């Protein structure tokens, strides 16, 4: 029970933090809970697709090759998870009347990502220990939130394109809302999967740089928040 609570705490804390960064017009809490729940549920199709793709990859490449590491982490995990998280946010919030400011998109996508991260964290911690919970609280959960920040920026541009009647731009930016966080996610997971001293140095430098960037980017987007327009 203690580990379960500890596993949920970082995701909930980050949802509260991103909620407070919305300085112009707070999002309905009911909507955010819905998005969070959809993010939790998105773990189910993600797990199924990951198992299927992993089996497909193993038909063509050996598990101990660099090719497999790249395919599995970028396509078999990152692409699938970011797609599922984006869909969770879209199904819950895209048509909601509260989605009327640009920063709203970041709040929604981060909330969806943290719903996903919360249940994933619980599953990992149930099979782990206190050290697992702390490590994931400091690394994995914030990484999901950062993916949500990246996703949210492009998600917001896609929403504005729809309001302008630009279907091509909308479609392009919805794809980017999955592809761009996939890159960060894929690099993160691949670095953890490779066994080399320099990789671990790269990983921790990467985490620090991305964390600092994401914090500054959220503050900037919050400060420049504006109403969505056609």
Show which residues each predicted segment covers:
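Hydrophobic alpha-helical segments at protein termini of multi-pass membrane proteins
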Residues: 1-230
């Amino acid at each position: 029970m203690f580990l379960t609570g500890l596993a949920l705490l970082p995701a909930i804390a980050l949802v509260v933090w991103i909620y407070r960064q919305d300085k112009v017009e707070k999002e309905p809490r009911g909507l955010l809970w819905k998005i969070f729940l959809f993010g939790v549920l998105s773990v189910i199709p993600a797990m199924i697709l990951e198992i299927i793709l992993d089996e497909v990859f193993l038909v063509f490449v050996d598990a101990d090759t660099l090719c497999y590491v790249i395919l599995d982490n970028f396509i078999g995990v990152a692409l699938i998870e970011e797609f599922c998280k984006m869909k969770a946010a879209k199904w819950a919030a895209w048509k909601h009347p509260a989605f009327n400011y640009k920063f709203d998109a970041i709040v929604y996508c981060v909330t969806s990502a943290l719903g996903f991260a919360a249940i994933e964290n619980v599953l990992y911690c149930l099979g782990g220990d206190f050290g697992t919970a702390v490590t994931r609280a400091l690394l994995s959960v914030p990484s999901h939130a950062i993916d949500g920040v990246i996703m949210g920026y492009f998600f917001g541009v896609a929403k504005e394109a729809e309001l302008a009647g630009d279907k091509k731009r909308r479609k392009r930016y919805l794809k980017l809302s999955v592809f761009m966080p996939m890159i960060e996610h894929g690099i993160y997971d691949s670095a953890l999967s490779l066994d080399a001293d320099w990789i671990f140095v790269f990983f921790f430098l990467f985490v620090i740089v991305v964390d600092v960037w994401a914090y500054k980017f959220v503050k900037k987007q919050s400060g420049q928040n504006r109403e969505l327009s056609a």
